[in-house]
A protein has these predicted regions:
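Auxiliary, metal-adjacent structural segments of Zn-dependent hydrolase domains
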Residues: 24-86
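Short pre-active-site segment immediately N-terminal to the catalytic Zn-binding motif
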Residues: 87-108, 123-132
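Acidic/histidine-rich, surface-exposed loop or edge segments in extracytoplasmic proteins
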Residues: 2-28, 86-87
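Glycine-rich, acidic and aromatic/proline-enriched surface loops and short helix-turn segments
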Residues: 118, 141-149, 178, 182
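Surface-exposed patches in mature extracellular/periplasmic domains of secreted proteins
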Residues: 42-62, 123-131, 152-158, 183-185
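Pan-zinc metallopeptidase signature
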Residues: 169-185
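Post-HExxH zinc-binding segment in Zn-dependent metallohydrolases
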Residues: 37, 127-170
Length: 185
C-alpha cells in the first residue's frame, strides 16, 4: 500500500518569467513530480501508510514572481506552497540544469515536510517558542539531508547547536537517527 499524498494542484502564477520557463524545462510534469517527492517525505517521516499521519487533502503548489525562496502555508488538510521564480533564476545563473534540479528538489522536500510533519504539543507555537521553531525547521532540513538534498557533509554548518534550526538542526537530527535511534526522524 502506498502513502496518500492528497490532491496536488499546480498553478503557474508567473508564466511570463524566465524562472517559470526554466522550471517547466526541468520539471515537465509538476503534479507527478510533487507527488513523488511527497511520497519520499512520507516514507522518511513514517514507518508505513497505516501510521497516524497528519492528513493532507490538498496541496496547492504555485510558482510566483516574488522575493524569497519558498514557503508553506495553510493547514487543516489544505496546504499551500509557493516557489519563487526569482530564486529559480538566481539558482540557474550558471546555466547548470543539474544544480537547479538538485536545489528545486531540496526546497520541495523541505516544504513538503512541513505539510506532513507532526508538531510539538504543549509548548506554544512556531511564532512564540524557539524550541518549536527549531524542531519544525530542523526536521524539514533533516528530511532534506536524509534524502540527499544537500551537498553531503560539506553542506553541514560547522559549530552551532540544534536550537539554530534549519540545516544545523537537520544534520544533527540525521546524526541522531544514524548513531542513536534509527526511528528518530
Amino acid at each position: 500500500k502506498s502513502y496518500n499524498v492528497g490532491t496536488v494542484l499546480f498553478e503557474d502564477k508567473a508564466s511570463e518569467t524566465k524562472g517559470s520557463d526554466i522550471y517547466h524545462r526541468i520539471i515537465p510534469d509538476a503534479e507527478s513530480y510533487i507527488k513523488e517527492q511527497a511520497r519520499t517525505v512520507l516514507a522518511t517521516l513514517y514507518n508505513s501508510p497505516e501510521d497516524s499521519i497528519t492528513p493532507v487533502n490538498k496541496i496547492h503548489y504555485t510558482l510566483e514572481d516574488i522575493e524569497g525562496i519558498s514557503a508553506k502555508g495553510g493547514g487543516n488538510g489544505d496546504v499551500t506552497i509557493f516557489y519563487s521564480t526569482r530564486h529559480i533564476e538566481k539558482s540557474f545563473a550558471e546555466n547548470d540544469t543539474a544544480k537547479l534540479f538538485f536545489e528545486t528538489r531540496g526546497v520541495l522536500l523541505h516544504e513538503l515536510t512541513h505539510a506532513y510533519q507532526l508538531e510539538p504539543q504543549g509548548i506554544g507555537s512556531y511564532g512564540t517558542n524557539r524550541v518549536f521553531w527549531a524542531f519544525i525547521e530542523g526536521m524539514a532540513d533533516a528530511v532534506r539531508v536524509a534524502n540527499g538534498g544537500f551537498d553531503g557533509p560539506n553542506a553541514r554548518p560547522k559549530g552551532g547547536n540544534y536550537m539554530d534550526g534549519y540545516r544545523t538542526a537537520g544534520y544533527f537530527f540525521v546524526w541522531l537517527r544514524d548513531n542513536k535511534d534509527p526511528e528518530f526522524l
